[in-house]
Design a protein with these regions (language model features):
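Selective recognition of specific alpha-helical transmembrane segments in multi-pass small-molecule
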Residues: 107-115, 189-203, 214-234, 296-324
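Membrane-interface loop-to-helix entry segments
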Residues: 24-48, 170-176, 183-191, 195-232, ...
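Flexible loop linkers connecting adjacent transmembrane helices
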Residues: 39-65, 88-98, 102, 110-143, ...
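Helix-loop-helix module between adjacent transmembrane segments
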Residues: 28-33, 75, 104-129, 135-199, ...
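Alpha-helical membrane segments and immediately flanking helix-loop junctions
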Residues: 59-91, 118-122, 127-136, 140, ...
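Low-complexity, proline/glycine-enriched hydrophobic segments characteristic of transmembrane helices
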Residues: 325-447
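Select transmembrane alpha-helical segments in multipass membrane proteins
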Residues: 22-28, 65-73, 145-159, 190, ...
Length: 447
């Protein structure tokens, strides 16, 4: 399992974690924005009129209204990415990552406009009368590249099963288990049956359910967020300052957060932006293809999707996280081996009464280390002595979730009893199967 996880990390570092990913995604949006004359601004009011029904736009074929198609697409986009994804962007890239999520959304509005228009234009009416569309159709018919269309369809299927479903179901199951002691298997089976009942009814039932759930879900979420923002209203303006102040310089260390470079803010902001609104991913055109609207008008409607999803919902989430200050606070949590490393030497993020770090040089060194820059920080290799779950070995520091871990206890993975004995460590990683608990930053949802 660990080897498979390492493979996924390697794959991520060479795809969404590479320099060309934000360049290609934002670059494509910039190209279409300039080439088409800034349609995300020019047609924004038209999109509102079509969705509200003030402007009539109907085609003779189709199974859903423009609003139903929009909410169906948003039902896949709005979710874990808007909550856990935002928290993860801040955790890895600092507050400045939110700015790059906004940039991704602004240019993603044009990308969405283009892909949805094409997906609707090249849609196909199946023998049973249902409508099918998406990038695989315009790749095959418009570009005459059937093998690429087949590859896209296969990868989209994996994406739908993976990031489209697993994070949401997993996090619901975790919350239900943690807060209400509901077995994870029961939650998974219940949600699976519920989804089956909806999906078996086809696009009409999916669209009907989505058009009712999405507005209600939005109202409940905004209501809860506004309560938190009202309690922390004095920190709203400073939160915006934190986002804009270090956009091109990276985020400085604050609290338990060790800081993030400009490259990390850009990379993770763009990656989480895509995960949030799916602009350029190719999933939305499949949902929008069923609309009765004309192709160009449904493309106009789709402009609203990244705006609502990222500019509005993600911004509210970001303000809740930043204004409450929880992103710099350490919480009791179970440590993940992939997010943990043991270092040589003792490092401290302790502060004086003025809020300044007592050992700023150590923080700067750790800041460089977590950003994979040159530093004098060395990963520990050797043996650790543990007695009744407590580390006896001195002169080491445990990093977890990009923060200095505190109050660490170690237990057996098999029976959960406090561990006593010797642990072997190689390049900062514990070889034995043990569980570690303690205080550290948390990255919110498990994405």
């Amino acid at each position: 399992m660990e080897q498979f996880n390492n493979f996924l990390i390697l794959l991520d570092s060479n795809l969404s974690g590479s320099w060309w990913f934000p360049a290609l995604l934002i670059g494509t949006g910039i190209f279409f924005t300039i080439y088409l004359g800034f349609p995300q601004f020019k047609y924004f009011n038209s999109a509102l009129k079509i969705v509200s029904g003030k402007t009539k736009s109907t085609d003779q074929d189709g199974e859903t209204t423009g609003f139903q198609a929009l909410t169906t697409a948003m039902s896949g986009a709005v979710g874990t990415g808007n909550i856990g994804g935002v928290a993860l962007a801040i955790w890895t890239g600092g507050p400045a990552a939110i700015f790059w999520m906004w940039i991704t959304a602004i240019f993603g509005m044009t990308t969405k406009y283009v892909e949805v228009t094409l997906g609707h234009k090249y849609r196909t009416k199946l023998s049973d009368g249902s409508i099918s569309g998406g990038p695989m159709y315009y790749i095959e018919q418009g570009l005459n590249m059937k093998w690429v269309a087949i590859l896209f369809a296969f990868l989209m299927m994996i994406t739908a099963i993976g990031s489209g479903n697993m994070p949401q179901i997993n996090n619901i199951a975790l919350v239900m288990n943690t807060e209400f002691s509901v077995p994870k298997l029961f939650t998974g089976l219940f949600l699976g049956v519920l989804l089956w009942v909806i999906i078996i009814g086809g696009i009409k039932r999916i669209a009907s359910v989505a058009s009712k759930i999405i507005p209600i879900m939005g109202l409940i979420y905004f209501g809860g967020a506004l309560i938190i923002l009202a309690e922390n209203y004095q920190n709203i303006i400073p939160s915006f300052n934190a986002i804009f102040a270090q956009v091109f310089t990276g985020s400085a260390a604050v609290g338990g957060f060790l800081g993030a470079s400009f490259a990390m803010s850009l990379k993770y902001g763009v990656a989480r932006g895509l995960y949030s609104n799916e602009a350029g991913q190719g999933s939305s055109p499949i949902a929008h293809a069923s609309s009765k609207n004309k192709s160009i008008d449904q493309g106009v409607v789709s402009i609203l999707e990244p705006f609502i999803d990222t500019i509005v919902v993600c911004s509210v989430t970001a303000l809740v996280i930043l204004s409450s200050g929880v992103w710099t606070q350490k919480f009791d949590t179970n440590f993940s081996k992939t997010d943990m490393v043991i270092l040589e030497g003792t490092y401290s993020d302790e502060k004086n009464i003025d809020g300044d770090y007592l050992y700023p040089k150590q923080i700067n060194e750790l800041n460089s280390y977590v950003q994979s820059l040159d530093s004098d920080v060395k990963e520990f290799s050797g043996e650790l002595t543990v007695q009744d779950g407590n580390l006896i070995t001195q002169n080491i520091t445990i990093l977890h979730s990009r923060s200095i871990a505190e109050d660490v206890t170690i237990s057996d993975q098999d029976d959960s009893n406090l561990f006593t004995g010797i642990l072997n460590v190689d390049n900062g990683k514990i070889i034995e199967s043990v569980d570690l608990q303690g205080k550290s930053l948390v990255s919110s949802a498990e994405l």
